[in-house]
Regions:
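Glyoxalase I/VOC metalloenzyme domain signal
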Residues: 1-110, 118-134
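Substrate-binding/gating loop at the entrance of the active-site cleft, primarily
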Residues: 113
Length: 134
């Protein structure tokens, strides 16, 4: 089965966002700056310090991101990043870290299937943090 990896777009703050996610989730972060990339001469000069491509890899997941020209970026609520945790402690800890500076839309609480919490992080990305019952 193929892997499904989220690719996030940002309005000039990809480096800050991906660094924040690394602090929350751990893993290895790689960043490619527009001005140091093979396509640098094809990009407008004002984008030279923006992120062309980034990747955050942990043992269990990988997600990527880049900056986008502000006039082309569309924010919406049709997609959530869902973290499935192994314990209640991990669920609450990751929820608290990701919610820092953002908006806690639904605190972690118990449902028939386990725990769930929903938040919008300080970069406008929507997350669900869950822990299923065994």
């Amino acid at each position: 089965m193929p892997n499904l990896n989220p690719y996030l777009t940002f309005n000039g703050n990809c480096r800050e966002a991906m660094t924040f996610y690394k602090e929350c989730l751990g893993g290895e972060l790689s960043l490619m700056v527009v001005g140091e990339s093979p396509v640098a001469d094809q990009m407008p000069p004002q984008f030279k310090d923006q992120i062309l491509h980034s990747s955050l890899k942990t043992k269990d997941m990988e997600f990527m991101g880049s900056d986008m020209q502000p006039e082309k970026l569309l924010d919406g609520n049709a997609v959530h990043l869902c973290l499935t945790c192994n314990t209640e402690e991990e669920t609450r800890s990751l929820y608290d870290k990701l919610a820092e500076g953002g908006k806690a839309r639904q605190p972690v609480h118990e449902m028939f299937f386990g725990l769930i919490g929903a938040l919008t992080d300080k970069f406008g990305k929507q997350w669900m943090v869950v822990c299923n019952k065994p």
